[in-house]
């Protein structure tokens, strides 16, 4: 578990709301296996709480190193709602994962008090957010807000991030090298087409009339 929701529900408590759920797979797996696992979890949630969730579909934008999809549910006013789930497939995790209790913010409608999940350490989360700020494809104000808040109010020292950022950059290089090799193989397969008949352009042919 990582990202803004992890910050709010595990180490920090009263924090900004996050619109999505972010995870990292400890062992890479395919899209169908991940969504099936979420279906099993949401079935258990529905049995315990009566609140039904369902898989809505993949993100319209394809992602090379993550499984991104939407889960739907019915809100308190009977209106359909959905939230995004982003599951990173391969990630260089530098610090040890921490098993932390989920902070109860709504005593009546929240998780049981003994619920705990594996979460990224604060160092790991902030390092990822700093790296995200350098990515032109993913420049979000919330990442800057999180870094600023943790560095000021949270008493977090940015000098602690040199090592995890360096390790993550090395890990990212290996990951993207693997992705580029995968892309080259994919393009090679597309280029290895069998024999195809020649196409001849008939300029004077009349179009077929549809009935």
What are these regions (language model features)?
Residues 1-11:
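Short gly/ser-rich loop at a beta-strand->alpha-helix junction or flexible surface loop bordering the NTP-binding
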Residues 9-21, 25-211:
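Structured mid-to-C-terminal alpha-helical surface segments
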